[in-house]
Amino acid sequence: MEEIKYIEPAALHDEMLRLRNEKQMDFLESLTGMDWGVADEGDAPNVTRGLGVVYHLESTVTGERIAIKTSTNNRETPEIPSVSDIWKAADFNEREVFDYYGIVFIGHPDMRRLYLRNDWVGHPMRKDNNPEKDNPLRMDNEETYDTTREIELNPDGTYQTQENVIFDDREYVVNIGPQHPATHGVMRFRVSLEGETIKKLDANCGYIHRGIEKMNESLTYPQTLALTDRLDYLGAHQNRHALCMCIEKAMGIEVSERVKYIRTIMDELQRIDSHLLFYSCLAMDLGALTAFFYGFRDREMILDMFEETCGGRLIMNYNTIGGVQADLHPNFIPRVKKFIPYLRGIIHEYHDVFTGNVIARQRLKGVGVLSREDAISFGCTGGTGRASGWACDVRKRMPYGVYDKVDFKEIVYTEGDSFARYMVRMDEIMESLNIIEQLIDNIPEGPIQEKMKPIIRVPEGSYYTAVEGSRGEFGVFLESHGDKTPYRLHYRSTGLPLVSAVDTICRGAKIADLIAIGGTLDYVVPDIDR
């Protein structure tokens, strides 16, 4: 069980600032909204009640980690100090918590909802929410506003509301998305332009929001597994691996070595699959049609392996609590061993046809620069963070599976531009092949599934587990009250930090470069919207 330190809201901002400056807690790993219910006279002294937030912090300098929580018993006008001035990652995460729970973050410059319509009534993640009563079916479009509100605390203890302008009437604003092939999903960017130069950008999420975290609260633990494949659908193995590990950790279940080997191999095949698709989509975004077909051709080989063993190509439903659903198909190992030298031998053609192309280099080099400090502050992990010089690989920071038994290099570039983000992923394909090669001939015998009770009840407590997804750290925060359903199940999206940084990355760039920058960030919209 995870130890979480409680801090009163009045002291939260000062304590968080101290942790950032004195303890070097520069990485806000996760921020989770909570509803712990109404306070009761019979509650034990250590029981937290009310609406609140759980923060997971990490120091990129010392590796130290800490979890903090705070809460307020005011359910009518819940207020907590914002930490968005300390960590940029808190910007979108606090908007998500406001959307879900109605907690207003004092000092946050943009208190709009993140996923739901701004005219939505109520807050769906509250335990007392009644959606049928509050929200009749609407047949009209949501109005778009160019202003937002900020609530500040005055020295005398009173609150002051001010209006912040997103775009004024003199600005030339264009919409890119939500129905645009280059946004890689239903993502909407409102972009203010001066000629072809981007002045600022407003990202609008929620067009494919399905309420997955809310649905989890009414599902048994085995039922929750199916929804992880629908988040980042290009990282289904990795997503479900994280959730299974979190539940197994909470229940004290140790899976067999065979299962660990299988899960690790599947995760790395998934990474290659995702990076090949990344290559193809980026090439298409820049008009390189020939390169587009290279990635799709070779990715099909991996999807065929998945289909033969797992039964699915994108939605695999393979990992399960205590193991995997089925053993490896007899053809799996021979096909993998054939694929490794094939891709190694042909990857130079990818570079010949696209990487070395003068147009591709001009569109990517020196464009869309994200500094290391901003990457950490926004929480941009994965290839984006490592392209900016931040060694943030979960497989190295917090080894899981059998990553502690293999030798692999963490790919890190320092330029922070679109080309560096591209090269990180291309180099990671080779490292994933190396990892698989070290494991494929050494898979031990053993059970593929531990014996489980018919009804799974996770011990009471709070738990956090993470894996290195294809786009960065995918985390799972679970709070259990000992029931057969989770009290709270929150996913740390790999894509939300990426899209929150788009405004910072794109300012001063050309409008055409927005497409290339989005392609190299490699976000998946259903993972953001959940």
Swiss-Prot record:
Q: Which InterPro entries match?
A: NADH_Q_OxRdtase_suD (IPR001135), NADH_quin_OxRdtase_su_C/D-like (IPR037232), NADH_UbQ_OxRdtase_30kDa_su (IPR001268), NADH_UbQ_OxRdtase_CS (IPR020396), NDH-1_subunit_CD (IPR026662), NDH1_su_D/H (IPR022885), NiFe-Hase_large (IPR029014)
Q: How does it sit in the membrane?
A: Peripheral membrane protein
Per the UniProt entry, the disulfide pairs are none
Principal subcellular localisation of the protein: membrane
Against SUPFAM superfamilies, the record matches this protein to: HydB/Nqo4-like (SSF56762), Nqo5-like (SSF143243)
The highest taxon in the source lineage is: Bacteria
An example of a Gene Ontology cellular component annotation for this protein is: NADH dehydrogenase complex
State what protein this is by name.
Answer: NADH-quinone oxidoreductase subunit C/D
The UniProt entry, under HAMAP family, shows: NDH1_NuoCD_2, NDH1_NuoD
Q: What does this protein do?
A: NDH-1 shuttles electrons from NADH, via FMN and iron-sulfur (Fe-S) centers, to quinones in the respiratory chain. The immediate electron acceptor for the enzyme in this species is believed to be a menaquinone. Couples the redox reaction to proton translocation (for every two electrons transferred, four hydrogen ions are translocated across the cytoplasmic membrane), and thus conserves the redox energy in a proton gradient.
NCBIfam families the record matches: PRK06075.1
Which portions of the sequence form the region NADH dehydrogenase I subunit D?
171-530
Family per UniProt? Answer: In the N-terminal section; belongs to the complex I 30 kDa subunit family. In the C-terminal section; belongs to the complex I 49 kDa subunit family.
- What is a GO molecular function of this protein? NADH dehydrogenase (ubiquinone) activity
Reaction catalysis annotation: a quinone + NADH + 5 H(+)(in) = a quinol + NAD(+) + 4 H(+)(out)
Region NADH dehydrogenase I subunit C, residue ranges = 1-144
Asked if Transport is a keyword of the record, the answer is: yes
Endoplasmic reticulum is among the record's keywords:
no
**E.C. code:** 7.1.1.-
Which subcellular locations apply to this protein?
Cell inner membrane
UniProt keyword annotations, A-Z: Cell inner membrane, Cell membrane, Membrane, Multifunctional enzyme, NAD, Quinone, Translocase, Transport
Subunit (UniProt) = NDH-1 is composed of 13 different subunits. Subunits NuoB, CD, E, F, and G constitute the peripheral sector of the complex.
Q: Where are the coiled-coil regions?
A: none
The record lists the organism as Bacteroides fragilis (strain ATCC 25285 / DSM 2151 / CCUG 4856 / JCM 11019 / LMG 10263 / NCTC 9343 / Onslow / VPI 2553 / EN-2)
